[in-house]
C-alpha cells in the first residue's frame, strides 16, 4: 500500500521557474500549452472573431484575486453549461482550508505592490491520489468587454474566472466543461470521498431511512466540512434548465451553503401561558446557492416569506442563520427540508475524513491501495487474469483483484471509495470511463488465499460508468470479509485506486496466492480444500443460568476459535473455516468451551469429524461428549470437501 502527497506539475510546467522568467523578461506569461485562442475554447476548429482574450488589468483598473475573502456569490455561471463545476466552486468557499489547497499561496498570487506582476497563476486539483498543479496565464475570454464564463459579482474579483480556466485546461478546453458530473468536480477540488445520493432511492430502499435521518446525516457531513451540491434531474433534454412554478430549475445544480434547525414560534399561540409553557416547534432548513446568481425558490421560507417573522432576531444572530436578502434575486435562498426532498432528486457530497491521530474530534483509519484490472496478456479466466468483470460473469468474476479485511467489532463502520484513472487528462478527446463497482462477501474466518467460487454477497455497490463509486458498510457481524473491485464486463483494463476508511483499524490486504504450499519445506502442493461450517450446539438439558460458550476447531497442525456467545441450551455461531490438505481423508476435532472470564475456561464437550474428499456439501449432526464420555448434546456441521484446491 502506498500513498503519495507530492504535487504533480501538469504539463511539467513549474510555476516558480516560469514566473521568474517572466519577471526577468518583464513580459506577462502567455501559456503555450493552453493558448488564448479558439483552440482552448472549442473541441473543433471554429471561427469566433468577436471573442477577445483580456487580462484582468484590462477589464478593471484595480484587479484582485480576492475581495474581502471568498463567498458563494463570488462564483456566478457564465454562458457555459458547467453548473456542475461552478456549484462545486461555490461549495468550496465554505471550507477555507480546502480553498487554500486549491488556490495555494493566494497572498503571493494577489495583485500587489509588494511583488511584481507576471500574469501567471497556479491552481491545484486532486487527481488519482495526488494534487495536480495547473499553471495558467490570466488572459480570459471576453465579449464586448465582459467575461464570457464564470465571474464574481464583485467586478474586480477574478479568482473564480481564473480557477475555471485552470479547470478547463485540465479538461482539454472550455467546451469539455459542458455537462460534467457533480461528484467529479467535488472530488477535484477537495480530494475527498465523493458520493451521490439518489433521494427517492435512499428513502425507499430502507423504511428506517426517513427524511429526518437523511437530514441529520447531511447536517453531520456538512458540519464536518463536506462539500455538498444538490440537483433536480431532467428526464429529457427538453427539460434541462426548465423553470418550475416554485422557482427551481430542472437539470441544474445548486451548492448547499447551510443545513440547520431553528425554533419557530407559533403566531397563533402568543398568550402568557404559551410564553411560560413554550409554543415553539423545530423547523429544518437548508440554504442553497444558484450558480446563475438568480432564480430562487419562491415557496415557504423564501426571501420575503412571512415565516421569517416567527423567528426571533436574537436566535437568527446567535445561530448565524439569516434570511437571504429579500431585496435582490441573487440566487441565495432558504427552503424547508420537506420541500427540498420533494423537489430535489440527487445530492452529491464529498466527505473529508479526519485521519489525524492527534485530533480531539473523531478520526478514521485510512488505507490506500493502487492496482489495476489487467488480463496480464492471458486468456479470460486464466489464473493470472485480473479483469474478470462483475458477478454476472460467474466463470471469470473471481479473477478480479481481491482484498481481505476483518471487522473487529459489530459497531465498526467501513467506507470504500473506488476511483479509476482518467486517461484523458488534458486532452480534448475524452475517453469514456469503464463501468465499475464493488462486491463484498463474508468468507471463512481463517481464509488467507484467493476465493475461486463466489459466496453470497452481503453488499454490492452501485455500478457506474463514472470516475468513482462509493460503498458504506455498517453494523456488520464480527468476522472476515472479502472486497472485490470489478469492471462490469471482463477484459476491461484500467488502473484503479481504492481508499478505505474505518473508525477502527482493520487489517486490509490483497489476496494474491491461490493455495498454500505444504510440508516441512513448503514444497508440496495442496491436493484438496475443505470448508467446515460450525452452525451451533444443542445441549440435551438446560443447565442453571446462562453460559458464555465458544468452539475450537482443530486439525493436526492448527486450531481456530469461534466468537463467544451467550446461551442456556442452544448456541448458534454459523462460522466457517477453510483447510487445504494433501490427503484424501481428513480428521478434525471440535471442542466446546465455557468462557469463564475471571477463571480458567472449562471444557464442556468435544466431537470428531471425519471428512472424505467426495466433492459434496454434506450437513451432519455429531454427538458431543463431555470429558467423562457422557453424551450431553449435539453439534451441527456442514462439510464441503473438494479434490481441487482451487475450487472454493
Swiss-Prot record:
Query: Can you give the residue ranges of the C2 domain?
Result: 502-625
Query: EC?
Result: 3.4.22.-
The cofactor binding remark recorded in the entry reads: Binds 3 Ca(2+) ions.
Single Gene Ontology BP term?
Answer: proteolysis
Which GO MF terms are attached to this record?
calcium-dependent cysteine-type endopeptidase activity; cysteine-type endopeptidase activity
The record ties this protein, via PROSITE patterns, to: C2, CALPAIN_CAT, THIOL_PROTEASE_CYS
The UniProt disruption phenotype note reads: RNAi-mediated knockdown prevents neuronal degeneration in a mec-4(u231), deg-1(u38) or gsa-1 gain-of-function mutant background.
Tissue specificity here reads: Expressed in neuronal, but not in GABA-ergic neurons, intestinal, hypodermal and excretory tissues.
> Which cofactors does this protein require?
Ca(2+)
This entry carries the following GO cellular component terms, namely: cytoplasm; membrane
Function, in words: Required for the correct female sexual development of the soma and germline in hermaphrodite animals, while being fully dispensable in males. Has calcium-dependent proteolytic activity and is involved in the cleavage of tra-2, for which it acts as a potentiator. Capable of calcium-dependent autolysis. Part of the necrosis cell death pathway. Required for necrosis of intestinal cells induced by B.thuringiensis endotoxin Cry6Aa.
UniProt name for this protein: Calpain-5
